[in-house]
Amino acid sequence: MKFVDEAVIRADAGDGGNGTVSFRTEKYVPRGGPDGGDGGDGGDVYLLADENVNTLIDFRFERFHAAERGENGRGGNCTGHRGEDKILTVPVGTRAIDEETGEVIADLTDHGVKVMVSKGGFHGLGNTRFKSSVNRAPRQKSMGSKGEIRHLRLELLLLADVGMLGLPNAGKSTFIRSVSAAKPKVADYPFTTLIPSLGVVRVDAERSFVIADIPGLIEGAADGAGLGIRFLKHLERCRVLLHMIDLLPADGSDPVENAFTIINELDKYSDKLANKPRWLIFNKVDLLSEEDTQAKISEVLEALAWEGDYYCISALTRDGTKELTYNLMTTIESLPQNKYDEIEEKVEKVEFKWDDYHAEQIKKAEEDDDDDDWDNWNEDDYDVEIIYKP
């Protein structure tokens, strides 16, 4: 199935059902009083994280999603049926952003998490609610409120412990093939990797971590060159970044300049990502003598003023990969237990509440009482007053 990590949808919650005006009429009960029921609440729209789903492709073809409208109230004090909720299944790691405000509505990082993204309208009141000592035969009702409508941008961010970045053909995919069971495509031309991929690295029978590979970056990626930087978002949840540096680039470029290219693109994308723990991985040491290898590594470290961790490996021959994976596992285990950077769930507060909304309608009806009660039964005023939500 095609990998799609972004989609824009419209989530329409259901409108609330209207209240109704009705009076109890039975044999021998000529003046039974009001019995108009309330409407039903509108259905809500939810996002549900499912580990069995791994792409947002379905939302590319179906962008409009609506919950059911609440049923209108009925006579006999019958309340309308609540509208059915709309539940949208998304991959674990999906983030929902309001297109209009840029607000993060939900961030679903665990299987089974269910978050409301669009709130259904509240039910209207039947005329029974407006009965009072001075208005025994109310002909007022209130309409159900409109359901919330949101335009959402869904973004899928891979959940991995370690993320890899580097120029095309630096050896990232070869490294993942050598340390995990994943088999990303490997070839001798740029941008062999077109979509992100994951691999599980098993250090021993009981310990493992997940590593993510994204398409290579080139100079100007922040401005759209190559595949751009749209895939860098998949590294936001990673706890450690591996910066792969090719010691002997096929195009004859300078490893120092290549290293600065990646660092500059990271800085342009996000300070948060640029400040994550990052290790330098010098690849293809099997193609150089030990003396040349040390000379090139020293040159890069000096130019970057690097004081962090670095490793020399050959992804093809697996030289140095075992030590690297063990040290990665140890580092991951030493980091705080919260696996991912928690993004505070920000659900927009609905501007009105049931109790306040209904109380306002009843108060307004009392103030505008038209003296239409059973004492004036012979009066010919049977018009129904409809109260609209302000």
From Swiss-Prot:
List ligand-binding residues for GTP. 166-173, 191-195, 213-216, 283-286, 314-316
Domain Obg: from-to ranges: 1-159
Q: Name one GO molecular function term.
A: GTP binding
Bridged cysteine pairs (disulfide): none
Q: How does it assemble?
A: Monomer.
Q: Which family does it belong to?
A: Belongs to the TRAFAC class OBG-HflX-like GTPase superfamily. OBG GTPase family.
Q: This protein is called what?
A: GTPase Obg
What taxonomic ancestry is recorded? Answer: Bacteria, Pseudomonadati, Pseudomonadota, Gammaproteobacteria, Vibrionales
Gene name on record? obg
